[in-house]
A protein has these predicted regions:
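N-terminal Rossmann-like or analogous alpha/beta NTP/dinucleotide-binding catalytic cores
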Residues: 1-100, 189-203, 243
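Residue-level signal for inorganic ion chemistry
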Residues: 12, 43, 75, 79, ...
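Glycine- and acidic
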Residues: 25-29, 176-181, 229, 395-397, ...
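An alpha-helix initiation/capping motif
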Residues: 33, 37, 41, 62-69, ...
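A generic structural signal for well-ordered alpha-helical surface patches
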Residues: 41, 192, 264, 375, ...
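Active-site cores that bind ATP or allylic diphosphates and position pyrophosphate for catalysis
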Residues: 61, 82-83, 87-210, 215-222, ...
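Catalytic adenosine-cofactor/nucleotide-binding cores of aminoacyl-tRNA synthetases and other
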Residues: 189, 201-358, 419-451
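C-terminal accessory/binding modules appended to enzymatic or scaffolding proteins
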Residues: 361-422
Length: 451
């Protein structure tokens, strides 16, 4: 599911919650070739991951084809539609004439009876007015006027009797009691055509709100060259759904200078009239900032599960006790993580099995003098009873004073012994993450093999 679709769903969800309405989900699957089971599942998975749950059972549009045809028959009886028997060759010739004359296509069957065409293939077209204008009152764009002379007689039913998108959405929105339609502004022209269908049936036209497109950082239409576009990609890249909701809400809408807000705040503040009409530009740095905020706020147990899944996906099998180790380490290493992938990288060192392999750079830090100093530090650490960050920081500072050196003289080597050269937090954080027995054991493996 494209992030533009995700933002549209989010704005619908926010507006429904804000107004006490219902957030409805309909799968518009009249295009049978594109509407595969996999494509539909992507929509369900994306909405589930984002936490946007529909208030009623999803409706599948194609299953309502009989109802759509019923409405077409009603339009035919009212004189608001007609059967068009033009052959493909005749239609192409009319298109050429229309282009040459600067007008829309008009079928000769618009005001003609079937004559001797009975039995020939036909489509059913809407009989659009040829004069005047159609007004679309839009909550984002304002009043948009369409000259009826520029609106063609759109097809309602294809030659095989299947309904077209523009017909189906009108019928379904009416039957489902939809009062507000919030969607991308690539549908703005459709709003005029759909308004004519509503009017042809004597139905109330819903309130329209057409959202501007999402552009890349350079102002161009968002494309693959700008990076990820699908919700699933952002999930795989380690973004949290609450961060995505917060970020997507800011793409075209905002509340003063507030950058970070809860779902409850967004629901209380959101009004579709406050959406700007200009395209929104993505800013990946802002998304990373938000994701870091939500990672720092998240329940460590939840992060442990998510990070554990990442480790498993990397063929790093978790053993008994690893979850507890991760949960202890995560609060100490998460502050700098912009994504869950970075958080997983930051916890690799706590899952390593002894004896650790040492990188060449890590080995280079362990000269004879440094080894001797770390042995002395190891004995002092063994005597620490309160294995917490504050106590360990104090002990490391005191040790440096006793040695008459700065922490930089032994800190990098200590971190290398504890992590094998893998990324690790500050010294006290690494020690607490590993726990006392594991920390001392790793020191012994390098400094006193066989101890």
């Amino acid at each position: 599911m494209h992030i533009g679709t995700a933002r549209t769903a989010l704005f619908n969800w926010l507006y429904a919650r804000h107004t006490g309405g219902k957030f409805l989900l309909r799968i518009e699957d009249t295009d049978r070739e594109r509407s595969t089971a996999d494509a539909v599942q992507v929509i369900f998975d994306g909405l589930k991951w984002l936490g946007l749950e529909a208030d009623e059972t999803p409706v599948f549009q194609f299953a309502r084809a009989d109802r759509h045809r019923e409405v077409v028959e009603a339009l035919l009886e009212r004189g608001g539609a007609y059967r068009d028997y033009m052959t493909p060759d005749e239609l192409e010739a009319e298109r050429e004439r229309a282009r040459a004359e600067g007008r829309v296509v008009r079928s000769p069957w618009r005001d003609a009876g079937p004559g001797d065409a009975t039995g020939r293939p036909f489509v059913v077209r809407l009989k659009s007015p040829q004069e005047g204008e159609t007004l679309v009152g839009d909550q984002v764009k304002g009043e948009v006027r369409f000259q009826n002379s520029q609106l063609d007689d759109l097809i309602l039913l294809r030659t095989d009797g299947t309904p077209t998108y523009n017909l189906a959405v009108v019928v379904d929105d009416h039957d489902m009691g939809v009062t507000h339609v919030i969607r991308g502004d690539d549908h703005l022209n459709n709003a005029a055509r759909q308004t004519l269908i509503y009017q042809g049936m004597g139905w109330e036209v819903p309130v329209w709100a057409h959202l501007p497109l999402i552009h890349g950082p350079d102002g161009a239409k968002l494309s693959k060259r700008h990076g990820a576009q699908a919700v699933g990609e952002f999930a795989d890249m380690g973004y949290l759904p609450e961060a995505m909701r917060n970020y997507l809400a800011k793409l075209g809408w905002g509340h003063g200078d507030d950058e970070i807000f809860t779902d409850a705040q967004a629901i209380a503040w959101f009004d579709i009239k406050d959406v700007v009409s200009a395209p929104a530009r993505v800013d990946w740095a802002k998304l990373n900032h938000l994701n870091n905020h939500y990672i720092r706020q998240a329940d460590p147990a939840r992060l442990t599960r998510l990070v554990g899944e990442i480790h498993e996906s990397r063929d790093r099998k978790l053993h008994d006790g690893d979850a507890a180790v991760l949960e202890r380490a995560i609060p100490l290493v998460r502050d700098g993580a912009k994504t869950l992938l970075e958080l997983a990288d930051a916890t690799v060192f706590v899952l390593a099995r002894r004896p650790l392999g040492m990188t060449e750079k890590a080995q280079s830090l362990l000269n004879e003098e440094t080894r001797a100093r770390l042995l002395r530090l190891r004995e002092r650490l063994d005597a620490v009873g309160d294995w917490q960050v504050a106590a360990l920081e104090a002990e490391i500072r005191k040790f440096a004073e006793l040695e008459g050196v700065g922490i930089g003289k032994f800190g990098p080597a200590l971190r290398a012994v504890l992590s094998g050269g893998a990324p690790a937090p500050d010294l006290a954080g690494a020690l607490v993450s590993l726990g006392k027995p594991e920390s001392l054991g790793r020191l012994d493996d390098v400094l006193s093999p066989g101890r």
